[in-house]
Amino acid sequence: MAEEGISAGGVMDVNTALQEVLKTALIHDGLARGIREAAKALDKRQAHLCVLASNCDEPMYVKLVEALCAEPQINLIKVDDNKKLGEWVGLCKIDREGKPRKVVGCSCVVVKDYGKESQAKDVIEEYFKIKK
């Protein structure tokens, strides 16, 4: 789980860093969203990072993604809600006030390209170094 309380570097927590990394990767067309795209990217070993929703209702999806991440040792991070993950990766409409509407749940996202170097990317990498 991406703990709210852990702050690598003392500036940004892991969830905030994850949102930044996903947003940057989305802008640079470096995301594979959904189980099919994610499985393809993981199988081809194009992935740098995999994000899986903990509330995924299909246990076989979870097993597949965990297995595909385990063999080549791709970093896997779990978030608690698929709707939140869907919002973070742009699977929603934004209304006039800037609030997300019609959010589509997303159970799995793979970052194929970070886009650019950032503090958020460093925080995520530091999180996995500490975790290992």
Curated annotation (Swiss-Prot):
InterPro entries assigned to the protein according to its UniProt record, in alphabetical order: Ribosomal_eL30-like_sf, Ribosomal_eL8/eL30/eS12/Gad45, Ribosomal_eS12, Ribosomal_eS12_CS
Keywords: Cytoplasm, Ribonucleoprotein, Ribosomal protein
Pfam families reported for this sequence: Ribosomal_L7Ae (PF01248)
One Gene Ontology term from the biological process aspect of the record: maintenance of translational fidelity
Keyword Cytoplasm belongs to the record: yes
Ribonucleoprotein keyword on record: yes
GO MF annotations, alphabetized: structural constituent of ribosome
Record family assignment: Belongs to the eukaryotic ribosomal protein eS12 family.
The protein's name: Small ribosomal subunit protein eS12
